[in-house]
Amino acid sequence: MSDTHDMTALVLFSGGQDSTTCLAWALDRFARIETIGFDYGQRHAIELDCRARLLDGLAQLRPEWAGKLGDGHTLEIPTLSAISETALTRDVAIEMGADGLPNTFVPGRNLVFLTFAAALAYRRGISHIVGGMCETDYSGYPDCRDETIKALQGALSLGMARPFELHTPLMWLSKAATWQLAYDLGGRDLVDLIRDQSHTCYLGERGARHDWGYGCGACPACDLRARGWHEYIAGSAQS
């Protein structure tokens, strides 16, 4: 990766654990940050409401981060849910499909997100885009794969005649390693902020608090987050 300390990045920021960690990662590396979130009719749209508290928390965590935070953007793309019969956009039970993918997979979601992000970045004069896609701890989503992101980077750069760079700092990290990255970036305060204020639960449940944060505790997203937290805590206790 080229030296980015005098550059601006656009971060895909949903209000979840991964995107918040990526935002902190970007704040640690770029001179200025803008964020973009998407309202596509997701059941867990409560994550969008978490963003303001997370941004305030990040700004208070480090004064230099506060000075780097720029404009925040939210795009509404309801057509994505209109063409997607998935458990993230419909009130149906979460289960595995015949194709081996869970029905939480929204076809083309990350492709659409990154394309809209690149279009906005183009208009804002930004060439660096940061996303929380991960191939290690994921549900088999094909649009989270490293080869997908690299192919899309090439397509976006060609299609807009601008050399975009898509950064995916979590691509090869387990969920436990993602918690550790948060600690490395901002210490216990950042870990606590992400645990208490970010949202991951697919069902949008924010009533029950667990040691790893809020959620139903049963959906795949909660299970992954919980297992990662417990592995992280176990590793921290041994070090």
UniProtKB/Swiss-Prot annotation:
Q: Which family does it belong to?
A: Belongs to the QueC family.
How does the cofactor bind to this protein, according to its record? Binds 1 zinc ion per subunit.
Enzymatic class: ligase
Determine if Transmembrane helix is one of this entry's keywords. Answer: no
Could you tell me what reaction this enzyme catalyses?
A: 7-carboxy-7-deazaguanine + NH4(+) + ATP = 7-cyano-7-deazaguanine + ADP + phosphate + H2O + H(+)
Cofactor(s) essential for the protein = Zn(2+)
Q: What is this protein called?
A: 7-cyano-7-deazaguanine synthase
Q: Report which superkingdom the organism of origin falls in.
A: Bacteria
What CDD domains does the record point to? QueC-like (cd01995)
Record carries keyword S-adenosyl-L-methionine = no
Q: Which GO terms describe its biological process?
A: queuosine biosynthetic process
One Pfam family matching this protein: QueC
User: GO terms for molecular function, please?
Assistant: ATP binding; ligase activity, forming carbon-nitrogen bonds; zinc ion binding
Known role? Catalyzes the ATP-dependent conversion of 7-carboxy-7-deazaguanine (CDG) to 7-cyano-7-deazaguanine (preQ(0)).
- Kindly list the positions annotated as binding ATP: F13, S14, G15, G16, Q17, D18, S19, T20, T21, C22, L23
Q: What is the lineage of its organism?
A: Bacteria, Pseudomonadati, Pseudomonadota, Alphaproteobacteria, Hyphomicrobiales
